[in-house]
Regions:
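FIC/Doc superfamily catalytic core
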Residues: 1-129
Length: 129
């Protein structure tokens, strides 16, 4: 069993896509790369040092990688939610329609990554038990 956080994200994404989206993994390398983005470093420092920036690059990486034959946006969204939950965080007051709209806007490049991170920050709250 691995303790690498990117491996845990990879395993979650594959499991979710297979069970909820009927998506088959068509590029393990692309998905592993996307799941590793939040943890990339340069000169010993994280490139994305905050939970917000890590969450933003995670979702962007998964949806743009097209690692599955179906369900890339849904899998990216749910992996984002899983990532936040692992950090005892969640998104507040986000309807399914709003979540879909923000993901589609990111995928179609109508929403910049920095603006998406800002959107996450606006909705981020501690996860209550």
């Amino acid at each position: 069993m691995t303790t690498d956080p990117s491996d845990k994200l990879f395993e979650f994404a594959v499991c979710y896509a297979r069970t909820e989206c009927s998506g088959s993994l068509i590029s393990e390398h692309k998905l592993r790369s996307a799941c590793g983005r939040p943890f990339q470093t340069f000169d010993g420092s994280l490139l994305h040092p905050t939970v917000v920036s890590q969450a933003a690059v995670l979702l962007e990486g998964i949806v743009l990688a097209h690692a599955f034959d179906d369900g890339n946006k849904r899998t990216g969204w749910m992996t984002l939610i899983y990532f936040l939950a692992c950090r005892h965080q969640t998104l507040r007051d986000v309807s399914d329609a709003e979540g879909e709209e923000v993901v589609v806007s990111l995928v179609t490049h109508n929403l910049l990554l920095a603006d998406f991170a800002g959107w996450i920050a606006q909705h981020l709250v501690p996860l209550t038990e």
